[in-house]
């Protein structure tokens, strides 16, 4: 509830400036879990006053079609965030397609430019959602991290690796074992 209240205030400030936040979600294929997840994102956008565009491409879409979709979204000035839902069909280069997303619109924080900032200890780019959420939960719970040892299970590009970087960043200063 607290996060949602903060978001509502931030969105209201944007709307006062005549800017409605706008998220595009691209889903390729028919993975049931992905469709449920995207549906919840679209409903959350509606609830919060964020405009959302939901783009569905068939499982047999070509990588070129997805590339064209991303490049088109990058060019839209009134669009503030792009999310390409994982997993993509096996015939697609997920990392290559992620690399095409404008880093300033990369809401997942997976673009190499955003991950590179994180490696440098900079928090001025888009940060991966789940690791950022973990850091907020630690803060809300009053758990001090400085000088502590943290264990991160897994090295995934989506959670494990960015989580270890956030925990070892300046100001957090944990010793991390992966």
Residue ranges and their predicted role:
Residues 47-49, 72-75, 101-104:
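Non-catalytic terminal and connector segments of soluble metabolic enzymes
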Residues 23, 45-59, 173-178:
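Short beta-strand elements in bilobed, periplasmic/extracellular small-molecule ligand-binding domains
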Residues 1-5, 51-60, 124-127:
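Acidic/glycine-enriched edge-of-secondary-structure segments
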Residues 28-42, 122-178:
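Glycine-rich phosphate/diphosphate-binding loop of Rossmann-like nucleotide-binding domains
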Residues 81-150:
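Anion-binding alpha/beta catalytic cores of soluble intermediary-metabolism enzymes, centered on
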Residues 65-77:
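Short, well-structured alpha-helical segments in soluble
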Residues 1-19:
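Positively charged, low-complexity intrinsically disordered leader regions
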Residues 13-23, 30-47:
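N-terminal glycine-rich anion-binding loops that anchor highly charged ligand groups
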């Amino acid at each position: 509830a607290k996060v949602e209240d903060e978001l509502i205030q931030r969105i209201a400030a944007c709307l006062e400036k005549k800017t409605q936040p706008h998220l595009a979600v691209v889903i390729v294929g028919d993975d049931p879990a992905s469709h449920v997840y995207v549906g919840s994102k679209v409903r959350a956008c509606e609830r919060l006053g964020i405009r959302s565009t939901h783009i569905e491409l068939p499982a047999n879409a070509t990588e070129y079609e997805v590339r064209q979709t991303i490049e088109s979204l990058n060019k839209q000035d009134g669009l503030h965030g792009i999310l390409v839902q994982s997993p993509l069909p096996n015939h697609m280069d997920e990392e290559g397609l992620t690399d095409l997303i404008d880093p300033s619109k990369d809401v997942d924080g997976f673009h190499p430019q955003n991950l590179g900032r994180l490696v440098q200890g900079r928090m001025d780019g888009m940060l991966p959602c789940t690791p950022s959420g973990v850091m907020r939960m630690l803060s809300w719970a009053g758990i001090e991290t400085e000088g502590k040892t943290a264990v991160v299970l897994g090295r995934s590009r989506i959670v494990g690796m960015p989580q270890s970087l956030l925990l070892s960043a300046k100001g957090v200063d944990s010793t991390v074992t992966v």
